[in-house]
């Protein structure tokens, strides 16, 4: 084992990287509430794992989506557990994200010089809510269908461009296959990619600036 370590150490100097990661100063005022962001990240990783597992069985068509979800719940080995964990961790992720935002706001973590960290965090919050909106429609049951119809119909109140925005979201004038395809693409590819990018930026900023001090 030491030979393997020495091989990597000689080429990558991993000990220096490990020392840098483990030697970061942690302020004495930090408590359990400062773990809310990390819990949110953990929920996101659970979402990725369980969501990836379900893509092997889910079919994003208006005629097969609901049946494929039922198949996951009843016929796939531990499918009920995978989907239930996905749903529970989604709710937990939103809750932890909200509590994290409140903690940062109440402790003044958004103030100079951490404005960019706050802005990136707000973007991540919007992405998290978008996960919920897009994922809610994927079973394509009555609840999901009407939720999509209502959510995508909201921009219609915008003057001049409202109808164009609605058509852009739905993929057509009415809710249908194009809408489900777009929401599935957003939920499984676009939003996870954006989350990964902004999370990386968020962590690098925190790493650079450190944790904010007490009030």
Swiss-Prot record:
InterPro entries for the chain: Cyt_b/b6_N, Cyt_B6_PetB, Cytb/b6-like_sf, Cytochrome_b_N_euk/bac, Di-haem_cyt_TM
Bound cofactor: record note: Binds 2 heme b groups non-covalently with two histidine residues as axial ligands. Binds one heme group covalently by a single cysteine link with no axial amino acid ligand. This heme was named heme ci.
Residues annotated to bind heme c: 35
CDD domains linked to this entry: Cytochrome_b_N
HAMAP family: Cytb6_f_cytb6 (MF_00633)
PANTHER family linked to this entry: CYTOCHROME B
Stated family: Belongs to the cytochrome b family. PetB subfamily.
Name the UniProt record assigns to this protein: Cytochrome b6
Phylogenetic placement of the source organism: Eukaryota, Glaucocystophyceae, Cyanophoraceae, Cyanophora
């Amino acid at each position: 084992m030491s030979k393997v370590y020495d091989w990597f150490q000689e080429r990558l100097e991993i000990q220096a990287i490990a020392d840098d990661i483990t030697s970061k100063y942690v302020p004495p005022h930090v408590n359990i509430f400062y773990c809310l962001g990390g819990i949110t990240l953990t929920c996101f990783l659970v979402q990725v794992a369980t969501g990836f597992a379900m893509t092997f069985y889910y079919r994003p068509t208006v005629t097969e989506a609901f049946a494929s979800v039922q198949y996951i719940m009843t016929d796939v080995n531990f499918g009920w557990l995978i989907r239930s964990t996905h749903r529970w961790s989604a709710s937990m992720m939103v809750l932890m994200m909200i509590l994290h935002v409140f903690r940062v706001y109440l402790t003044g973590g958004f103030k100079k010089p951490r404005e960019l960290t706050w802005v990136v965090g707000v973007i991540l919050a919007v992405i998290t809510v978008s996960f919920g909106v897009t994922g809610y429609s994927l079973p394509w049951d009555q609840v999901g269908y009407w939720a999509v119809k209502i959510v995508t119909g909201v921009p219609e109140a915008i003057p001049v461009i409202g109808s164009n925005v609605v058509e852009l979201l739905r993929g057509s004038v009415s809710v249908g296959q194009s809408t489900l395809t777009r929401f599935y693409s957003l939920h499984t590819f676009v939003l996870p990619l954006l989350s990964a990018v902004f999370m990386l930026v968020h962590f690098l900023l925190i790493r650079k600036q450190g944790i904010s001090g007490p009030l």
